[in-house]
Every structure is written in C-alpha cells, then in structure tokens.
Amino acid sequence: MAANYNNSAWFYDSLARLVYGKALVNAQIYLLKHIPENGKVLIVGGGTGWILDDLAHIHPSGLQITYVEIAPNMMALSRKRNVGNNQVTFINDAIENVDLPADFDIALTPFLLDNFTDENLAKVLNSIAALLKPNTLWLNTSFQLTGKWWQRIMLKAMFIFFKLTCGIEASKLPGIDKCFEEKHFKLVEQQSFFGEFIGTRIYQK
C-alpha cells in the first residue's frame, strides 16, 4: 500500500529542482514557521531529509522529531542531515505499521498523501491522525489541480514516471481536502506555488 521512492533516492532532489526550480522546497519551507519551540514533531514521508537541515536552522535545539520514511535509500540520506541538537528518531517503515504514543504537537506530510488511492489515503490519514494531540496542526504539501490545462499533463507524466520507477499506486490525485474534512479537520491556512500546481494546507485537528 505504501508509496516507496527507494529507486529514486539518488536523483529525486535533482529532478525536482530541474522541473520545479525551488517551488517544491519553498512550499515546504513556508510551513516551518508553524513548528513550535520544544515541540514534538511527526514527519511522515520526508524523502531525502533536507527538511531536517532547515528545521535545525530555525530550531537548533529543543525539538523531538520522529521521522518516518519507508524507503531505505531515502532514510540513509536523511540520517546524514544536520539536525543540530534536536532529538531525532528515525523509523524506516510505513506509518500504518508504526506504533507510537498519541502525543505529537504537529505533523508534516510533504508530498505524501497524493501517492495513494482514495481508499488507502483514508487509512494513512487515520494512522497519522490517531497520533496527534487535540487541536494539533497538520502541515501538508501536495500537488493540486486548479483548472489549468498544463497541470493535468504534468501530473499524468509524473504518475506514469513514478509508477514505472517506484511502483506508486496512484494514477490520479485522491480527494485529500475531502478526506481531511470527513475526519473533521479544519482548514486554517493555505498557499499555492508553481502556478497553483503545488498547494500547502494547514489543518487543525
């Protein structure tokens, strides 16, 4: 069920920069201002882990980060990141297989949820939601379609490419906003990047 980008670890960041410039990075950095000092942070699907470097720049110490990533090669790159004096627990597994206490202050899912079918998206969302405290913020970044013709072409090309190279299950975007709404999360902030093809959302439990 889980999307696994293990085969793309060595070229993923370079490909992202080639296609999107800094848009993928900027969309995620935009959300980091919401990470609380001394917070307990859950990151699911962190990829190559560059976001840990940026978190350490903002919060050099005090964070307790649990970093869940299913792809071993991605995890190997993530472990090499500069985390400052923050405490990081690396878990190389799918989030639905992980047993953690339900005491996280904030969750980040960068380009994770758009990899699943609607059925499996609901399961993944439930697994993460169960680990969050009441009123917790969930910071999500995903691709989105806003009616521009080129977005569908790029999206289809991405799904075909990563289905062939990494075996992702999705062939179209799932209903991410709808799924959050059904789980009674409140949308509190949103921002778009790269011609509205990339959307960041902040939800509150």
Labelled PLM ranges:
Residues 108:
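A conserved beta-strand element that flanks and buttresses the S-adenosyl-L-methionine
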Residues 42-97:
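Class I SAM-dependent methyltransferase SAM/SAH-binding core
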Residues 122-134:
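A short glycine-rich, Lys/Arg-flanked "PGG" loop and its adjoining helix->strand segment in the class I
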